[in-house]
């Protein structure tokens, strides 16, 4: 089964996991890592490496991070690069995590989707769920409905 690890600044990873569990129920295959304010980056990196090594079984692993090129992302990449070649090949780091992406990952986890296909769909879901709404758009639609 696809393993999921969420690595973020603050408690965001725990919040994302909690929100997902409200929607789809609990999962024993989602791990979280929180970079706390003032925490030593090297120490955090060691924790990420330990947890990633612990969960990285023969199954593929998705590591979600909140910001690319930030500390959680960099530490995740460093940890992945220390895995065996086989485990490294089965691990993907995805930046810019949001709740739709996590839900999509959980769906693919349950469906046992091949990792390459799952990653493609997860990233698409994350992008497709970005939108902007403003009241002026509603007013315009109301005006157009009059005709």
Language-model features: locations:
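N-terminal loops that bind phosphate or other acidic moieties
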Residues: 2-147
């Amino acid at each position: 089964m696809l393993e999921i690890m969420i690595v973020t600044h603050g408690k965001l990873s725990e919040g994302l996991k909690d929100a997902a569990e409200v929607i789809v129920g609990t999962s024993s295959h989602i791990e979280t890592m929180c970079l706390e304010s003032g925490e030593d980056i090297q120490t955090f990196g060691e924790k990420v490496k330990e947890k990633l090594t612990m969960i990285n079984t023969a199954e593929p692993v998705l590591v979600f991070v909140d910001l690319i090129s930030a500390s959680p992302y960099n530490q995740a990449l460093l940890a992945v690069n220390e895995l065996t070649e086989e485990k490294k090949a089965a691990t993907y780091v995805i930046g810019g995590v949001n709740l739709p992406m996590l839900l999509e990952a959980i769906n693919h986890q349950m469906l046992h989707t091949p990792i390459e296909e799952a990653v493609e769909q997860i990233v698409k879901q994350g992008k497709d769920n970005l939108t902007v709404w403003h009241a002026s758009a509603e007013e315009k639609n109301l005006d157009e409905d009059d005709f």
